[in-house]
């Protein structure tokens, strides 16, 4: 089914996003229940359910942020590309938003704002979180006095002030 295919494709993103240790992946000879339980824990089907708790994020992603695609190459012979194409609008958006078009004006506004200004701000990212790639980590390379970008080594989507390395945590607290 399309949802199952999407879950298989989502798995690799989820694994990196949440910093899941490879050692937690069940062995190939594990029983079916162990494998299915692990798979559902990593990327449950509720992510692709109608009226999802993060539905508003999906609307904003389609309209303002953009959204990641999937690497289907390893699964090419198993996945129907037509089922996957346009899945975000077809599967994750309420029908009334099906015709929403991407508008990069908010993205450009934010980028211009950070380029032209130096607000007192702390940005925290995890090194292995795929979302870090779309962050404004490029601010580290600018001569900004007030904008500080911290990338937690080995960190995931769970990167927080409390779990930063001590030296970074001290810099963050000093900035606050």
Locate the predicted segments by residue:
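Alpha/beta-hydrolase fold active-site neighborhood
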Residues: 1-105
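Conserved alpha/beta-hydrolase "acid-adjacent" motif
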Residues: 72-73, 130-135
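The feature captures the conserved acid-bearing segment of alpha/beta-hydrolase catalytic domains
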Residues: 105-116
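Short beta-strand/loop motif that positions the catalytic acidic residue
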Residues: 117, 123-125
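Conserved beta-strand scaffold positions in the cores of enzyme catalytic domains, especially
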Residues: 123, 146-151
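Solvent-exposed loop/turn segments at secondary-structure junctions
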Residues: 128-130, 156
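Short, solvent-exposed amphipathic alpha-helical segments in soluble enzyme
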Residues: 138-142
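Catalytic active-site module of serine/aspartate enzymes centered on a nucleophile-bearing elbow/loop
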Residues: 151-176
């Amino acid at each position: 089914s399309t949802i199952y295919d999407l879950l298989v494709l989502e798995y690799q993103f989820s694994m990196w996003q949440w910093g899941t240790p490879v050692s937690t992946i069940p062995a190939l000879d594990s029983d079916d229940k162990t494998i299915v339980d692990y798979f559902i824990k990593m990327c449950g089907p509720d992510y692709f359910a109608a009226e999802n708790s993060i539905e508003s994020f999906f609307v904003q992603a389609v309209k303002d942020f953009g959204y990641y695609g999937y690497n289907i190459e390893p699964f090419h012979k198993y996945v129907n590309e037509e089922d996957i194409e346009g899945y975000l609008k077809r599967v994750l958006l309420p029908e009334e938003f099906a015709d929403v078009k991407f508008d990069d004006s908010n993205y450009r506004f934010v980028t211009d704002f950070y380029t032209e200004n130096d607000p007192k701000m702390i940005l925290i990212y995890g090194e292995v979180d795929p979302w870090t790639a779309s962050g404004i980590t490029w601010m580290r390379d600018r001569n900004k006095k007030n904008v500080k970008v911290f990338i937690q080594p080995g960190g995931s989507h769970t990167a927080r002030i409390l779990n930063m390395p001590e030296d970074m945590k001290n810099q963050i607290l000093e900035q606050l």
